[in-house]
Amino acid sequence: MSGETATGDVNKIVMLTSTATRPNGSNRKVKAYIGRSTWAPPGTVYLPGASTNISEQFNGNGFLVSGKDTNQWGAVGSGSASPILGIATSVPASTTEVTSTLGSSKYSLVTGLGSNPSVNTATTLDVAQLATDLINSNVSVLNLQADDYSTLDFGTSATNPKIVHIQGDSHVKCGSGNHPTAVGYGVLIVDGNLTTTGLFRWDGIVIVRGTSVSISGGGSGGSTIWGTLLAKQPASSSSMALTIAGSSNVTYSSQAIKTVTDKWPSAFSTNSRIIAWNEMM
């Protein structure tokens, strides 16, 4: 493939050739193409932990959590990847609690894999370890102190994503109209609690390592995340509170996530698989 080097794997595929020699001297040769599965989050919103350690609020009828693949800044469902869960938990009791809190009148506001509401238990993801691996990925990390942010560009475009590490609580907010002033592309890691309001936009992965995350906004549009929102699993003596309100949207985007996994692949471990093979002789 054009651009491939000994140390630069462009297409992320390895070709292996195996030759077997029989006692009579005849040979059989097989060529296999090995690649890695595409990384995908457990759900658009991942809320791990025992039901006694999590709480959630879904305020209003204007929000949307969707596991339908969506291209960045596109219509819901405009992507081509398979859908994932709208909200994923790590234990069945938490799935029951989230579904009950949501209430039947809001089932249609959480879509994705399966029927509405798209809420179910999924394979556990170590969010804390993922955050650590990203921070330690030997790239330039934008480290910020706990604060309110309203006019920063956290990564200027989909082709120039950043890892943004806020070391404490943060309120990320934005102005009015259709011109968000707090935008970002890449990975946002918040060590404390995260609150977003107004027209905040993020393309990629948002990781919250505190005890609460609130995604809200009003008017003609609310906070929007294209990609995934991952909460750290709370310790047995701690908790995690999730609030989704207003006209906010959290939408799965394999396109936005691929920007991250391509930029920092070492942080995302996936299983190897045979993509294709053929017998050569």
Predicted regions and their residues:
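A Trp-anchored, charged/polar loop motif used as the substrate-binding/catalytic surface
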Residues: L142-D153, H171
